[in-house]
Amino acid sequence: MPSATTILSDLPDDVRLHRLEALVVASETLQRASGLDDILHAILDLVSNQLDCERATVFLRDRRTGRLHARQVTGSTPLDIVLEKGVGVAGFVAETGENVLINDVRSDPRFDPSTDRRTGFLTRNMLCVPLRKPEGTVMGSLQAINSRHGDFSDADLAYLASFGALAAIAVEREQLAQEAVRAQLLSTELELARKIQQRLLPPPGRLDLPAPFSAWGASQACYDVGGDTYDVVMLSSGECGFWVADVSGKGIGAALLMTTLQTELRALIRMERDLARLASELNTRVTTVAPLGTYATLFLGVLSADKGRLRFVNAGHLPPVWAKGQAASPTEFEASGMPIGLLPGSFYEAGETEFPKGERLALFSDGVTDAENTSGETFEPAGVINAHAGIRTHEVEQIGPAFFEELDRFRIGAPAKDDTTYLVIGLD
């Protein structure tokens, strides 16, 4: 079609001057407008006034679904209009990027009369142009409906296209500004979530426990927040309770479930001595709040210094390893139940074993065993055992850092793909 400048030159001088002045005013108005709704309202007021039409509409594309949503409509009460991809004139324009002028909509197959039927409005003629980003992507469409002076002209269409170009720039600018605000809010929320998590987890390093217990732990989140958790608590019985849990998934969702899990565990371990019943109750509580398909593996132990015995329950978690230097070896603490939160009504079996004085037990999440090096090889449970076998000290505050050094040496600079949690428990 001819350019806007060419068509404007065909208009009478007074009309041409008026329209050019209106475009300048439109540009200034859109630069001053703040907020997407204000920008869209300003666009439609300008279109309605300059083209003297009964109704004007801005449609914006939903980037997720591809549907068009009528964000602003003039000449009526706000309408909830949603168009599937390619439906109606607005949908056609958004898909093809073409400018459309129709002076008899009933004779044009692109026109969709369903909105008229819903509202009682009678559409006679219309103009529709794409809202195009600077790089060419169409973000929506701009419509002018029912000229009050008869038919729309090519000059009207070119004029609306000029408004559409200004509107697209303003909308794109505002959407980018909104995305920046959302990103900042998300960053703030992530930082808050990270701080909350840090308060729920023990501080990394040696944990403050009465003799003869000792422990060292650390958890490194793959993202700003993680789904792994661990803790060590002294019980009124004089026993030492401890656990490592790994929530499925990563990021905010996993962190929320981790928070629930940590809070519930701290309460239940002080109320319920039977670890099988404790795990069942924990599973019940978690399944009521966790989204479907979200779960956590868990190894939970209670160590008695007087008896030299360890009671434990394993809910789908990796078995720990004995971590005393050259005597490092796998344990037989295999899973005795489903992961926590996976299935309502799950039952668990508790186990018990000897825990000699001087022994060390290492617990870890699958971020350890699944760690990859630059060749794509994984650390595996065997890597955990071999790493401990090479550590010559028996002090937990030295075992922990030495183990992470071995893990980092294996990775050779490859980035972590999952949260990494490690806890070593000792009885002296």
List PLM regions with ranges.
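… and, occasionally, acidic/histidine-rich disordered N-termini of signaling adaptors
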Residues: 177, 181-362, 409-428
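Short beta-strand-to-loop transition segments that serve as allosteric relay/switch motifs
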Residues: 6-8, 73-76, 141-150, 171, ...
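Signal-transducing coupling segments at domain and membrane junctions
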Residues: 67, 76-78, 103-125, 146-148, ...
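A short, aliphatic-rich beta-strand micro-motif
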Residues: 124-135
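GAF sensory/regulatory domain recognition
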Residues: 45-48, 55-81, 85, 106-107, ...
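Signal-transmission linkers at sensory-effector interfaces
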Residues: 1-38, 139
